[in-house]
């Protein structure tokens, strides 16, 4: 089974503006290493010429941050400074507007949301944008699933653990509801949930982080898992739960409804 995650998606596109290694030199980083977005990127220019000989459109992959320039909110000062610097170096929509070719763009990897400003910045030669956390969807902008988290360091084998589980027959859940999430990423949405279900014999509440094997084991042992909004509307937990054939419990939101209407029925 090919599991959905950002790096796997980037490999399906004609050109990706991020390195696959998630690495700066010999140091692994939380961010994918960015490639230059601009006409000075000769590797990209050569790929455009190559693809144009075959068809009149090209598929591109980029992180959410460098898709277009906009104001960033609800970020700490360090992250905001880093993200703004990345946008100043170049954005994909601006680059596409300077080229005589059609493009279809896919995004993943970072959870910075897509806001209303994007609709005025999409050039005519961009046919469609499939973007994660596309809160302002519609027109050429289509919501896309976040999927699983990419490998973040050399010893990160979470994807392999899920693949191993899925290679075996599913088990029958023995309990009803599992709760395990940090509260600091979104206190407004997450504070108080543990207390609602704590002490119920049909629910398991983990207040502390557990190992990934144990985390997945608990998901499989329960029919449902509470999946509150974190840094963004969509999160990796939702897709871990779905891949393990359990039901994520989420607060109703138009974006999540739009996303699930086209995706969840196919899983």
Go through each PLM region and give its residues.
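Nucleotide-sugar donor-binding catalytic core of glycosyltransferases
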Residues: 1-239, 243-263
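Short acidic-hydrophobic, aromatic-tinged amphipathic segments that line or gate anion-handling sites
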Residues: 265-267
């Amino acid at each position: 089974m090919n599991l959905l995650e950002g790096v796997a998606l980037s490999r399906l596109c004609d050109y990706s503006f991020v390195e696959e290694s998630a690495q700066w030199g010999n140091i692994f980083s939380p961010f994918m290493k960015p490639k230059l977005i601009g006409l000075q990127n000769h590797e990209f220019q050569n790929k455009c010429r190559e693809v144009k000989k075959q068809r009149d459109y090209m598929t591109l992959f980029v992180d959410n941050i460098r898709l277009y320039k906009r104001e960033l909110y609800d970020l700490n000062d360090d992250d905001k400074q880093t993200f703004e610097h990345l946008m100043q170096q170049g954005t994909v929509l601006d680059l596409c507007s300077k080229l005589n070719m059609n493009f279809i763009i896919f995004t993943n990897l970072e959870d910075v949301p897509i806001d209303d400003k994007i609709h005025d910045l999409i050039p005519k030669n961009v046919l469609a944008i499939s973007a994660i956390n596309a809160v302002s969807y519609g027109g050429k902008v289509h919501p896309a699933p976040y999927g699983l988290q990419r490998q973040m360091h050399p010893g990160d084998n979470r994807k392999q653990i899920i693949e191993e589980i899925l290679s075996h027959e599913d088990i029958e859940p023995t309990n009803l509801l599992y709760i395990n999430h940090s509260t600091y990423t979104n206190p407004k949405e997450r504070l108080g949930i543990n207390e609602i279900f704590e002490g119920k014999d049909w629910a398991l509440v983990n207040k502390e982080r557990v190992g990934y094997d144990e985390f997945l084991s608990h998901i499989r042992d329960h029919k449902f898992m509470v999946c509150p909004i974190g840094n963004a509307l969509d999160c990796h937990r939702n897709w871990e739960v779905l891949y393990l054939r359990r039901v994520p419990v989420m607060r109703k939101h138009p974006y999540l409804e739009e996303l699930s209407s086209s995706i969840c029925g196919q899983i």
